[in-house]
């Protein structure tokens, strides 16, 4: 049975009945198929669930909670979504959530702390999501490289402090960089280890294979590429290790790291990730919301100011004007409100 609700027709009818805009409503559901459909609109989406698997986290709602009482409590506190997304969002002073995700490796379940979602280039939200832009610009060579390191460090710190309520953490490390590449997590891991008085494993945890870039690889290819790629030079019998990464796509790299840590005796491995790559990403209409330069007509991209980390849009034209995030948001919201198709009918088969 395939669920076609909510459709654009039902969406339009709800907006008309409530006299609201698309960006002023939120869908609440326990049904993952309904969730997938609801995510195709630029409305809020709340998923009510007792637990989240990694596969489910790859199609995540804006807000995830365990029940309707929990949802009411979160809204009363002003909680708006994932911790990372809330912290990075411009002018935000809201609270955010760290979502525990069940990550399966060789039949064993590991705790993954999810701080937000990452929308890749194929997702319609890619150029509409400040957190995704912050993550990718921060790790890509360019003017904004590293500009969000302190912000991301604070997110990791908050998560570790939360974990320490129920876990005795002994060691910390990040996914090792390929041979000859810069370790982007070096200073972050050093500070986290020092602040929490735990052992820094990065010096003894290394990548020994210059495996190919994983972006275009399948799940099977990724697993094969990183097989035996990571080596820990010492035993860590019984230790609880925190493993840090930024963007997780298939999880193949994290799995390879966990296998090596466990092989060297780790009792428990807990992952903390800035964002889980979001699958799907098809907008309900072929006319997805995008921002175009008013000077030259070319598409604009969200960028990060290298001085203060603020967001803006640019088409990179030498004589064209950039657009502030606030103004871009206003224009995109106007586009969204004008594009609801009211001719489609609802069907549940």
Residue ranges and their predicted role:
Residues 17-24, 31-33, 37, 43-54, ...:
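PRPP/pyrophosphate-binding module of the type I phosphoribosyltransferase fold
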Residues 303-314:
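Short linker/helix segments within small regulatory modules
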Residues 86-171, 207-235:
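Active-site-facing substrate-recognition patch
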Residues 317-346:
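Short metal-binding segments enriched for Cys and/or His
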Residues 26, 167-178:
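Short glycine-rich phosphate-binding loop at a beta-alpha junction
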Residues 293-296, 315:
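Short cysteine-rich clusters marking metal-coordination/redox-active sites
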Residues 2-5, 192-212:
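Histidine/lysine/aspartate-rich catalytic loop segments that bind and position anionic ligands
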Residues 1-26, 31-97, 282-286:
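Asp-based, Mg2+/Mn2+-dependent phosphohydrolase catalytic module
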């Amino acid at each position: 049975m395939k669920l076609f609700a909510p459709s654009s027709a039902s969406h339009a009818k709800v907006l008309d009945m409530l006299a609201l805009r698309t960006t002023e409503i939120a869908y609440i559901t326990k049904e993952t198929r309904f969730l997938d459909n609801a995510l195709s609109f630029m409305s809020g989406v709340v998923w009510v669930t007792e637990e989240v698997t990694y596969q489910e986290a790859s199609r995540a709602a804006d807000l995830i909670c365990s029940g309707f009482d929990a949802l009411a409590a979160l809204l009363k506190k002003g909680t708006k979504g994932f911790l990372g997304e809330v912290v990075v969002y411009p002018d935000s002073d809201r609270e955010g959530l760290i979502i525990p995700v069940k990550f399966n490796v060789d039949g064993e379940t590991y705790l993954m702390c999810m701080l937000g979602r990452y929308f890749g280039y194929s997702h319609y939200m890619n150029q509409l999501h400040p957190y995704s832009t912050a993550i990718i610009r921060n790790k890509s060579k360019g003017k904004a490289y590293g500009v969000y390191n302190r912000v991301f460090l604070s997110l990791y710190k908050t998560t570790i402090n939360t974990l320490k309520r129920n876990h005795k953490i002994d060691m910390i490390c990040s996914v090792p960089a390929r041979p000859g590449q810069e370790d982007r997590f070096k200073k972050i891991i050093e500070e986290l280890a020092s602040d929490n008085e735990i052992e820094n494993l990065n010096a003894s945890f290394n990548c020994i294979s210059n495996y190919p870039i994983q972006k275009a690889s399948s799940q099977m290819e990724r697993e094969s590429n990183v097989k035996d790629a990571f080596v820990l030079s010492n035993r860590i019998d019984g230790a609880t290790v925190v493993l840090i990464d930024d963007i997780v796509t298939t999880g193949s790299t994290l799995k390879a790291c966990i296998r090596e840590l466990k092989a060297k005796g780790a009792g428990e491995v807990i992952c903390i990730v800035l964002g889980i790559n979001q699958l799907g990403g098809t907008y309900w209409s072929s006319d997805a919301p995008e921002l175009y330069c008013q000077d030259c007509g070319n598409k604009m991209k969200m960028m990060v100011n290298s001085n203060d980390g603020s967001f803006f849009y640019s088409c990179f034209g030498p004589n064209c004007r950039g657009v502030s995030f606030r103004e871009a948001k206003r224009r995109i919201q106007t586009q969204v409100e004008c594009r609801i198709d009211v001719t489609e009918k609802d069907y549940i088969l």
